[in-house]
Regions:
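Membrane-proximal structural modules of membrane-associated proteins and complexes
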Residues: 1-113
Length: 113
């Protein structure tokens, strides 16, 4: 909500926050990374604040809901938060997909009542 508190009700939600932890991997290259989040709403459409919000995955341009390009990964566990504050948030099931370095690195599902 407006005070950045977690809520379960869609009518109280003003934005969606996606929290994740990039696991430690001493074999991975270090440096800045871009993370993309796709949030698929109850109607099956990807929530996006712009029609230009696109990134490449498996040779196709696909829409993203939120992105961060300033993630400085140094091979150690790193918490990251991304925010979506576009279209009105309605009740229902939302599917969340997380992408980095050309891979889908995570998925989750949330339900707002």
């Amino acid at each position: 909500n407006a005070r950045d508190q977690q809520v379960q009700r869609a009518r109280r939600a003003t934005r969606l926050r996606v929290d994740l932890i990039l696991n430690a991997n001493p074999m991975a290259s270090v440096g800045e990374r871009s993370i993309y989040v796709r949030i698929i709403g109850p109607g099956g459409m990807v929530l996006a604040s712009s029609s230009n919000a696109l990134f490449e995955f498996e040779g196709e341009k696909i829409t993203y809901s939120a992105m961060r390009s300033d993630v400085d990964y140094q091979g150690e566990a790193l918490p990251v938060s991304l925010y979506y504050s576009g279209d009105a948030i309605t009740e229902g099931k939302y599917n969340v997909e997380i992408y980095m370095d050309g891979y889908r690195i995570g998925t989750n599902e949330i339900i707002l009542k």
